[in-house]
Amino acid sequence: MVESTFEPNITTKSVGQAIRAHLRVLKLTKKPSREEFLTIAKVAGAGILAVGAIGFIIYVLLTMLPQWVSQ
């Protein structure tokens, strides 16, 4: 059986620890350069287009294939 990891006893100490952990991560981050941002945007856009193209191909096959088989 899976044990619940829910922690019902939220204290100010645990909230403070969580905030400190998040702040530590935020201090390590940096704003991406324009070139880095554009590269990430291009890769993400290409991925979205690829998934959309695959979905469209599946849609066309599922709508046209029954017509071809029944003829």
UniProtKB/Swiss-Prot annotation:
Its main location: membrane. Keywords: Cell membrane, Membrane, Protein transport, Translocation, Transmembrane, Transmembrane helix, Transport. Belongs to the SecE/SEC61-gamma family. It is found in: Cell membrane. The keyword Transport applies. SUPFAM superfamilies: Preprotein translocase SecE subunit. The keyword Ligase does not apply. The chain crosses the membrane at residues 43-63. Essential subunit of the Sec protein translocation channel SecYEG. Clamps together the 2 halves of SecY. May contact the channel plug during translocation. One of its GO terms (biological process) is intracellular protein transmembrane transport. One of its GO terms (cellular component) is plasma membrane. It is a single-pass membrane protein. Disulfide bonds: none annotated. HAMAP family: SecE. GO terms for molecular function: protein transmembrane transporter activity. This is Protein translocase subunit SecE.
